[in-house]
Amino acid sequence: MKHVLCAFIVVALFALTACDNKSTPTAHAPTSQNFVDVASTTTKPTTQTANAQAIDCQAITNTLTTIDASSQIDDFDKVDKLLNHCLPTVDNATQIKWATQYQLAYQRFLSFWQGDTFLFDDVEFNQLNQVMYDIHYHEKYDESDIAKLPPKAQHLIKQVKQGKLKIANHCEGEFDFNNDYQAFAKLFTPHLPKDQAVLIERLASDNQEPLWCDAGFSVSLDELIQRALFWQDYQKTYPQSVFINDAKHLSLFYEFLLFFGSENTYWLNDDKTEFITYINENDETFTDEASFVKLAKHDSELGKKAGAYLEFIATPKDERDEKYPINPANLAKRDLNNTGQIEDWERATLQLMTALGSTRADVPNCINAPICLPASDEP
């Protein structure tokens, strides 16, 4: 996608790893592709045993690893049929490998890049973005507008209208295509152990819509709290899960978002001495303090940190240097040699990190997909 999908955490506290998008090179001409919508065929039903014997399950990996931006949705339809027969017959490591390969294949398929070449010119991309806007917001649009799009774009829009793909709204008029994460979960989770099924079902639910919206959050504070609590509880419920490290990463990530916010979503003033007051549509004033007070009463590690958070806010600024000395490790990550180089707002953030025992949390490869993905496209 030509735009950058993710704007990140306050004061550049995160080392962002989630987005691989590139800027659109206007010098490149769009690549010509042929996209033909293949009608689904009806196969004669046979028993699972017979099909398992007849089907080469290795074809799953071979097909998934060759799918790219020039492929068609029909390739996934074929893989789905293979998976339905083969998933019950293989070990868990292979099941996870296929699930990962499947999502990576979808990401390549939905990409607007073919190698180093962007598939649309600026005019075509803007036309596509407008159609995606109209469909997402249920606005009226002319079918002729779709007919004017390049074949690749027409193919993807058709799959959206048929319910096979979703349009993701990144705000500020920027959109993306996603596969249906609930369909992903329905395909894989019946064959997985409970801990793995629970994780995938949760990610499918949380991640279908983007977390980020114009350098802020698309979800409420209370939703962030629920996500942070979920991943904390997951670690206690499934300590031996093969996904335990992913759960730990997600727990730290959402905890950090909860207490530190983002560039355009935050709960405290710069000095972190009081909650920001908002005015709702009825001209009523409110703050987010009640959510943290409620969380502080929760019998959990997150609840204890919420209590420490409220205590920090109540601590006068002139007492914080002694009570909450800045962790040198956090200072070093900011490439600062001493506290004298720190702005007041940044000092408050670093002191709050001390109060909560927090460090910076990288964005996990688990917030844009129904499964945590490897850092490279090589599962």
Model-assigned labels for residue ranges:
Residues 89-93, 115, 119, 186-194, ...:
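Short solvent-exposed coil/turn linkers within tandem alpha-helical repeat scaffolds
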Residues 20-22:
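Bacterial signal peptide processing site
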Residues 138, 142-170, 179-225, 257-298, ...:
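Short coil/linker segments at helix-helix boundaries
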Residues 15-18:
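C-terminal motif of bacterial Sec signal peptides marking the signal peptidase cleavage site
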Residues 58, 275-379:
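Hydrophilic extracytoplasmic domains
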Residues 31-173:
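N-terminal Sec/ER secretory leader and immediately downstream segment
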Residues 2-9:
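Sec-dependent signal peptide recognition
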